[in-house]
Amino acid sequence: MADLEEQLSDEEKVRIAAKFIIHAPPGEFNEVFNDVRLLLNNDNLLREGAAHAFAQYNLDQFTPVKIEGYEDQVLITEHGDLGNGKFLDPKNRICFKFDHLRKEATDPRPCEVENAIESWRTSVETALRAYVKEHYPNGVCTVYGKKIDGQQTIIACIESHQFQAKNFWNGRWRSEWKFTITPSTTQVVGILKIQVHYYEDGNVQLVSHKDIQDSLTVSNEVQTAKEFIKIVEAAENEYQTAISENYQTMSDTTFKALRRQLPVTRTKIDWNKILSYKIGKEMQNA
């Protein structure tokens, strides 16, 4: 092991550490970070070399953060990334600094938004917040209005998690939806992601995603937002139901098929008497 450590350069050590951090299960970033810190045994190298991994993890996981002085949480996503560690809260029209290691927001300041699309963004956000409140008790959503390739675009992000470390499991739901404001109809594109980790007496992970495409009728802001939510609700319900049904099918068929109903001898074993069987055999061989 010592020889292997001597062969690894600092760059290689940081690269390996960064991979561990980026792939940390939801709710277990601190545990993975602390383990990697012990393995690397060089805090300065870890903080400087793996800083990009801390940021990538929060962006990928849609990490929610509370900003002091504001009621609602905002998601840390690539769509709100303003560079240099600053992020946008489109609802409150502020930008703030975010510490990717401590997961803390500081220095909130007023920030400009795309006024041309703000009425559309607000309508979608209002409808989406009502949907999230109904379907995700711990859910957080953030809606962005941006110009992408000259087109006015709405991007809606949802995050909901359950962290149950005492019960040895953690899980997170993420979904991202996009559509452009175009006359008559537009295309809605979404991606749904589920990640769950169960680690009592084992290590089992569920990592699943599904891509969605649908058409949306564009009229006024409020009606378009309502139609958009119908698409979101139908797709997310269908996805969650399908996963539940697949797990039930696996439990009823696949896992049962892996178990042998009877041992090779075709005779059931009385486990309460197994010890006496062993003692008797040893006595016969004596």
Curated annotation (Swiss-Prot):
Q: Which GO terms describe its molecular function?
A: actin filament binding
Q: Which UniProt keywords apply?
A: Acetylation, Actin capping, Actin-binding, Phosphoprotein
Q: Which GO terms describe its biological process?
A: actin cytoskeleton organization; barbed-end actin filament capping
**What's one Pfam family here?**
F-actin_cap_A
Chain ranges passing through the membrane: none
State any GO CC term.
cortical cytoskeleton
Record keyword Acetylation present: yes
Q: Quick check: keyword Phosphoprotein in the entry?
A: yes
Q: Which residues carry this modification: Phosphoserine?
A: S9
Domain of life of the source: Eukaryota
Instruction: List every position bearing N-acetylalanine.
Output: A2
What InterPro entries does its record include?
A: CapZ_alpha, CapZ_alpha/beta, CapZ_alpha/beta_2, CapZ_alpha_1, F-actin_cap_asu_CS
Q: State its role.
A: F-actin-capping proteins bind in a Ca(2+)-independent manner to the fast growing ends of actin filaments (barbed end) thereby blocking the exchange of subunits at these ends. Unlike other capping proteins (such as gelsolin and severin), these proteins do not sever actin filaments.
The record's subunit annotation is: Component of the F-actin capping complex, composed of a heterodimer of an alpha and a beta subunit. Component of the WASH complex, composed of F-actin-capping protein subunit alpha (CAPZA1, CAPZA2 or CAPZA3), F-actin-capping protein subunit beta (CAPZB), WASHC1, WASHC2, WASHC3, WASHC4 and WASHC5. Interacts with RCSD1/CAPZIP.
What protein family does this chain belong to? Belongs to the F-actin-capping protein alpha subunit family.
Recorded protein name is: F-actin-capping protein subunit alpha-2
Q: Which organism is it from?
A: Aotus nancymaae (Ma's night monkey)
What taxonomic lineage is listed for the species of origin?
Eukaryota, Metazoa, Chordata, Craniata, Vertebrata
